[in-house]
Amino acid sequence: MACQCFLVGAGYVALAAVAYRILTIFSNILGPYVLLSPIDLKKRAGASWAVITGATDGIGKAYAFELARRGFNVFIVSRTQSKLDETKKEILEKYPNIEVRTAAYDFTNAAPSGYKNLLETLNKVEIGVLVNNVGLSYEYPDVLHKVDGGIERLANITTINTLPPTLLSAGILPQMVARKAGVIVNVGSSASANQMALWAVYSATKKYVSWLTAILRKEYEHQGITIQTIAPMMVATKMSKVKRTSFFTPDGATFAKSALNTVGNSSDTTGYITHQLQLEVMDLIPTFIRDKILTNMSVGTRAAALRKKEREAKAQ
């Protein structure tokens, strides 16, 4: 009898766990993308300026345009001043009623003095939104000792993917804390959700972004500051090397609009409904099967990249 009661109880617990998982999946997919209305971002930010790093290409540039569309002044940060000037011109042509400032910074420079100078420039304005977007990936997937670009590339990936969200957040948070308002968006990657073979350093550094952001949410949960992780899958950008959009692959502008609509409604999400759907489905697959699928995809990507590299070498 006791054994029977235990089995019945265990069955109810298992059923409750399955029901909770299903509800969580539907909540993650439908909540921020269908059911919940976007918040008043300007009110949540508490200030009129938005800082965006890596803002001259891809997702970062799209965030800059979308924030400008929503009436924010934008402070764009990237490595090359000429590209910053061109991006500034493009933004002002489309949104002439806002202000755009630029700051050139090479994020491979890990020196604290460099960050102090950059933060001194940025903190001259009241920053309501900080989008830590700048990032670096592999040229193509490979095992650690064969990564294209070698030690230098690995060092740059580690530096660029981890230091900016850490140090810029630390340097801009004081004014947000003083106002008890502000939004920080740390752009990671869905590569952080898995231990991805052939992407070791990229996957690991994006996991750092995810953990850092989650811990910052705990540290500042009573300060009126919204701190969000965005972990996209494939977006048609220069870094992803994907040119064509599809149902699962939005362009940067579509993605940025969707992602900003989730601020305040989800603290950790992919930023796009079909990305979230993919992530939730992948999460249901046993780890050993998921790892095999992802590794096979990466091996295929590497093979295609090496064939292209060989063709280009022969053409020279």
UniProtKB/Swiss-Prot annotation:
One of its GO terms (molecular function) is long-chain-fatty-acyl-CoA reductase activity. One of its GO terms (biological process) is molting cycle, collagen and cuticulin-based cuticle. It is an enzyme of class 1 (oxidoreductase). It catalyses: a very-long-chain (3R)-3-hydroxyacyl-CoA + NADP(+) = a very-long-chain 3-oxoacyl-CoA + NADPH + H(+). Its EC number is 1.1.1.330. Pathway: Lipid metabolism; fatty acid biosynthesis. One of its GO terms (cellular component) is endoplasmic reticulum. Pfam families: adh_short. Belongs to the short-chain dehydrogenases/reductases (SDR) family. 17-beta-HSD 3 subfamily. This is Very-long-chain 3-oxooacyl-coA reductase let-767. It comes from Caenorhabditis briggsae. The lineage of its organism: Eukaryota, Metazoa, Ecdysozoa, Nematoda, Chromadorea.
